[in-house]
Amino acid sequence: MKPTGRGYLLLDAHPVGCFRSVELMRAEVPVPEKPPARRPTALVIGSSSGYGLASTIAGLVRYGIDGVGIGLERPAGHRSATAGWYRTVATDAIARELGADFSFRNADAFADTTKTETLDLLAERFGGVDYLIYSVAAPRRTDPRSGTTYQSVLKPLGAPHTTRNLEFADDGAAQVREVTVAPATEAEAAATVGVMGGEDWSRWITALAERGLLRSGFRTVALTYIGSPLTSAIYRGGTIGAAKAHLESTARALTERLAAVDGRAFTSVNGALVTQALTAIPGIPLYVSLLRGVLGDRFPSPVAQSLDLWHQLTARRPDVDDSGRIRLDRWELSEPVQAAVAERWRSITPETVTALADTAWFRAQCRALYGFDVPGVDYTVPVATDLPWPES
């Protein structure tokens, strides 16, 4: 199997490469000296990719969680299954090896039927939930109650924004291209909040509360991002930022509601990483490549940041900022790092991009999302692609 596609989007995923990616993530997690006195129950919404996947692996290996993970993935057909399908198969193998009672559901997290069926499973098998991690990146959401489908857009607010984007030619050569993005309409901004804001997260908490499944001390977290001033017009100051602001206000409202069970809701401001969603945001691929160029191997992996997240979630007094947010991005937003990235951003040209930005690393990371360019995999060996979803 060879990678085929256009730009950052590949059409197939390599099963063995995806398995190996999960193995490498697991290897980053330190094994505790002794198992927990009680296995906590966690619900991870968005467990098949990104920080949701990393948090699931870290939780299984380091914190001994049981529970349920939810992802929405496509099985093999004319093409391979999606990468998240294979990553879930690999993560399930880890859970079974560790003796964890952890089920994976292939379902639309936005749907009421998914909530009902998942809560039925949680009630029957565990009787309650200690943690809920909400890590959903979706282009659209259908509200099951109104029937309205919201479509998110990646646009600035108020005025057009011109930035530079990192792209790759068919031969892998890095290119820098200037792009201008038109501002979002009010309707587009509202729709993006409808997809990526806190409404669905809040509905999950409400559903758990109505079923009496919130254990004492329950904690929940949704992942957010602030990012650099270099990307603020398209990210924090754009439609996505409006959705993240709604997510953060939802956390404050949820904390008030969770007082009855001595619970808390947080947003976690994580640092940059390479995801399929990120590659679609103009300017972000170049910024992350420059950030890696500055930091080198000091760039924290998703697993490293997820271990920090679990440490904060399980701490008696989590380290939060003045807005009540867990901050895992201080390494990225430190003044020396941002100054160095900004200097490279100002200096970059098509001729200097490979010297100033770690473009080879970024391209490899993007391909690894689909199971390609993963160390330790022989890509000349034929592979089976039609693998079953893990049994509950």
Swiss-Prot record:
Site (Plays an important role in discriminating NADH against NADPH): 73
Binding site for substrate: 225
Record keyword Lipid metabolism present: yes
Signal peptide range in chain numbering: none
GO biological process: fatty acid biosynthetic process
Binding site for NAD(+): 46-51, 72-73, 108-109, 136-137, 244, 273-275
Entry EC no(s): 1.3.1.9
Taxonomic superkingdom: Bacteria
Positions of the catalytic residues: 235
Enzyme class: oxidoreductase
Swiss-Prot/TrEMBL catalytic activity: a 2,3-saturated acyl-[ACP] + NAD(+) = a (2E)-enoyl-[ACP] + NADH + H(+)
Gene3D superfamilies: NAD(P)-binding Rossmann-like Domain
One Gene Ontology term of the molecular function aspect: NAD binding
Pfam families xref list: Eno-Rase_FAD_bd, Eno-Rase_NADH_b, Enoyl_reductase
Pathway: Lipid metabolism; fatty acid biosynthesis
UniProt keyword terms in alphabetical order: Fatty acid biosynthesis, Fatty acid metabolism, Lipid biosynthesis, Lipid metabolism, NAD, Oxidoreductase
NCBIfam families: PRK13656.1 (NF010177)
Role of this protein: Involved in the final reduction of the elongation cycle of fatty acid synthesis (FAS II). Catalyzes the reduction of a carbon-carbon double bond in an enoyl moiety that is covalently linked to an acyl carrier protein (ACP).
Family indicated by similarity: Belongs to the TER reductase family.
PANTHER family noted in UniProt: ENOYL-[ACYL-CARRIER-PROTEIN] REDUCTASE [NADH]
Alphabetized HAMAP family for the sequence: FabV_reductase
Subunit structure, as described in the record: Monomer.
Protein name: Enoyl-[acyl-carrier-protein] reductase [NADH]
Origin species: Streptomyces avermitilis (strain ATCC 31267 / DSM 46492 / JCM 5070 / NBRC 14893 / NCIMB 12804 / NRRL 8165 / MA-4680)
